[in-house]
Curated annotation (Swiss-Prot):
Subunit structure as annotated in this protein's UniProt entry: Heterodimer of Ku70 and Ku80.
Subcellular location field: Nucleus; Chromosome, Telomere
Gene this chain is encoded by: KU80
DNA-binding is among the record's keywords: yes
EC assignment: 3.6.4.12
Enzyme class: hydrolase
Protein name (record): ATP-dependent DNA helicase II subunit 2
Length: 715
């Protein structure tokens, strides 16, 4: 595609929206250029020699693939001019000449390009209309036609009821001439305001149809029997999930000093495509995967394993079962591309929740009239019998087979089979849920009236509220008649288009102090129910609240976790269970029952000193377990005690007690103060992530996430 923008007197309001969108496609064949009309200087960019009538025209950019750097350069160059001289049609002739030169082959024949010229003008100034017919004939050239789009600033728009007041006679004359010229070129004539409004509507990505399967639809085995049905078909995607752009990891680029040689860039060639110099201070990073195993010679340490030393295996229970490469060939299911019918099912008997995948179209092979006739007959037979076909599909050699459902689809201009993937028996999840309208007792008695079951009054109120919130007739068509509200073709994915919008905005506005633009109205239009519909259904909603006995729940009081026992929910009886049972305020930590006794000690009192005393006793017992452990026999109990101690102190919002303890324990382990070399215990603590409690885990902690992460490092 080759496109040129003619921008007059700085009227480039749509530039910041349309160009970044085109750049985001990354297509090398999408060539663009920008030509300024009525500029202060004249620069034809070498397209033609400067001649009379071509003054005050400037080629800001030659016809090429636009990248981010080109947009930013163009932003700096485009400024309002101080002159009214310059002929718009001369600029158009320059644009046509530029497109011709860039889209011709070596033999002088036009190449296969979509050619388009977009003109943005206010219609002021003089226009030489002597050569209109010749220019229009060139634009309509059947061998290389050009799509012409003219957008006028403050042009009269009868459709929207706009008419410029106090319009000069020169502009009125130019509007009439330009409109007739554009219509003669079979182009599009509109206003800039209308174009900007249209740009707010997300542009859907046009994808080239790529077949996922080319083969034969068969009924029976054509390799062994003659009485078989064989139709040549092709399979194309019908629906496919549109995913938003994904973020990549980047590192801040190091600034090299003057005169120093820059080393090789870490940025990938994909990131640097077409850019001689990066436009940001970020550099793409490379990922490297390392495989490690326990080092038997150095307990607690790891050693790297090369890729050629790895073997494949499957987990069987807790054991890895090795499968050699020769055996892997036996495990693989040998399949060949095929689409064979295995059965039929009545349409009313098919459960709509069964499809697993996106939908695809099955159409006859291109140019094969016999296949078209055969498939059309098969589609009509299924449609008239009100049946669906079930088939076994293998799209490529050695790929696992899938079961698909073939549904006939007949429209006015086309016919096709729509296929969706069906689950195997192993794919099904048959959960049983209790009924919503009755309860079953253990004895088998059916109860229809219960506090957890809806009453007739509630059911009736809900039914009326649903009817009042009906969206199927809330909208209005062009004639003002009731129509569906929020049609699928009018709804767009907010996440896909919003992320794309922000990427384009930040690319052209790199200043981080600038606020982000709000999302388009069309993306938020259907985020909430229509206000008019909510107002109209107020009475039904109030009746539903009354029937359901809806009451406001008091807000939850934020406290200091378990510490303040006085604020806990008291039992209905009002009795103090701890006082009745005679539980003491201080509980001694029992080494033989370490975890339960520690929890009891914390629950016995709210006093901070008591909590510190319990934590100190727990830390002593943990050190004792590690010190007296033969090998790693006692490490399991110690790790469990560490986990409980960390969780309980975090819940009590006393992370500083834990952080002080774990710092000391790390030092003792690495310095060998717990009866010898206990570094392997530290590696187990590190592997279980029993380190410092940071602010992310407890808002009262004074440890940052960076400090908590660095704590696991060993100097």
């Amino acid at each position: 595609m080759a496109a040129i923008r003619l921008i007059s007197i700085g009227l480039w309001s749509m530039f910041g929206i349309r160009l970044p969108t085109q750049v985001a496609t990354g297509r090398k064949s999408a060539l663009m250029s920008v030509i300024g009309c009525r500029t202060d200087e004249t620069d034809l960019g070498g397209v033609m020699e400067e001649a009379e009538g071509y003054e005050n025209l400037r080629v800001f950019s030659e016809l090429k693939q636009f990248l981010l750097g080109d947009i930013r350069t163009l932003q700096d160059q485009l400024r309002p001019s101080k002159t009214n001289d310059g002929d718009l049609l001369s600029a158009l002739a320059l644009a046509v000449q530029m497109i011709d030169g860039a889209t011709q082959g070596k033999g002088g024949k036009p190449l296969k390009y979509d050619r388009r010229i977009i003109i943005v003008t206010d219609g002021r100034g003089s226009i030489d209309t002597d050569d209109l017919e010749q220019i229009a004939a060139k634009i309509r050239d059947p061998e290389a036609p050009v799509d012409l789009v003219l957008l006028g600033v403050d042009f009269d728009d009868p459709d929207n009821g706009f008419k410029e007041e106090d319009k000069s006679s020169q502009k009125a004359k130019n509007e009439v001439s330009l409109k007739g010229f554009v219509e003669d070129c079979n182009g599009v004539f509109g206003t800039l305001a209308e174009a900007i409004d249209q740009l707010q509507i997300p542009r859907l990505k046009e994808t080239r149809p790529v077949p996922s399967f080319k083969g034969q639809l068969t009924l029976g085995d054509p390799g062994h029997y003659d009485a078989t049905l064989t139709i040549d078909v092709e399979r194309y995607p019908c629906t496919m999930l549109a995913k938003p752009p994904t973020a990549s990891s980047f590192a801040t680029r190091t600034d090299f000093g003057a005169g120093s040689a820059a080393g090789p860039s870490d940025e990938s060639s994909h990131t640097m495509t077409g850019e001689e110099q990066p436009m940001t201070d970020l550099s793409a990073v490379r990922n490297q995967r390392v495989y490690q195993v326990d080092n038997e010679e150095e307990p607690g340490m790891k050693k790297n394993v090369e890729m050629d030393e790895l073997e494949r295996g499957y987990e069987y229970g807790r054991t890895a079962v090795h499968i050699s490469e020769s055996d892997m060939n036996v495990v693989k299911l040998e399949t060949t591309p095929m689409l064979s019918l295995i059965g039929f099912v009545k349409a009313e008997a098919f459960e709509r929740y069964l499809p697993l995948s996106r939908s695809n179209f099955l159409v006859p092979q291109r140019g094969n009239q016999a296949a078209q006739l055969s498939l059309s007959s098969f589609i009509h037979a299924l449609y008239e019998a009100d049946c669906y076909a079930v088939a076994r599909l293998v799209t490529k050699e050695l790929k696992p087979p899938v079961i698909v459902l073939l549904v006939p689809r007949i429209e006015v201009e086309w016919e096709a089979l729509v296929d969706v993937e069906l689950p195997f028996e192993e794919d099904m999840r048959r959960y049983k849920f209790p009924p919503l309208d009755r309860k079953l007792t253990i004895s088998g008695k059916v109860i229809t009236e219960h506090k957890d079951l809806p009453t007739d009054e509630l059911t009736d109120a809900m039914s009326k509220y649903v009817d009042a919130m009906d969206l199927s007739t809330f909208g209005r068509d062009e004639d003002g008649n009731p129509a569906e509200y929020a049609k699928p073709e009018d709804t767009f994915s907010p996440i896909v288009h919003r992320i794309g919008h922000i990427i384009r905005w930040r690319a052209t506005h790199p200043d981080p102090s600038l606020p982000m633009p709000p999302p388009s109205d069309i993306l938020t239009k259907y985020a909430n129910p229509p206000a008019d519909l909510l107002d109209a259904s107020t009475s039904q909603f109030e009746a539903l609240k009354k029937a359901a006995r809806v009451s406001k729940v008091p807000p939850k009081v934020k406290g200091r976790g378990k510490r303040n026992r006085a604020e806990r929910d008291k039992p209905i009886s009002g009795l103090d269970i701890d006082a009745l049972l005679g539980n003491p305020n201080r509980v001694k930590i029992d080494p033989s029952n370490l975890v339960p006794s520690f929890k009891n000690a914390l629950a016995a009192s709210d006093d901070l000193e008591t909590i510190k005393e319990a934590a100190q006793s727990m830390s002593t017992e943990i050190r004792s377990l590690i010190r007296s452990s033969v090998g790693d026999s006692g490490y399991g109990r110690a790790l469990e005690a560490l986990r409980v101690m960390r969780d309980e102190l975090t819940e009590l919002e006393e992370p500083e007690i834990w952080n002080e303890f774990i710092r000391g324990l790390k030092s003792d382990l690495l310095e060998g103060k717990l009866n010898g070399n206990r570094k392997d215990m530290w590696w187990k603590i590190r592997g279980n992530r029993y380190g410092l409690v940071d602010r992310k885990r407890s808002f009262v902690s004074d440890v940052t996430e960076e400090e908590a992460s660095a704590f696991y490092n060993v100097a």
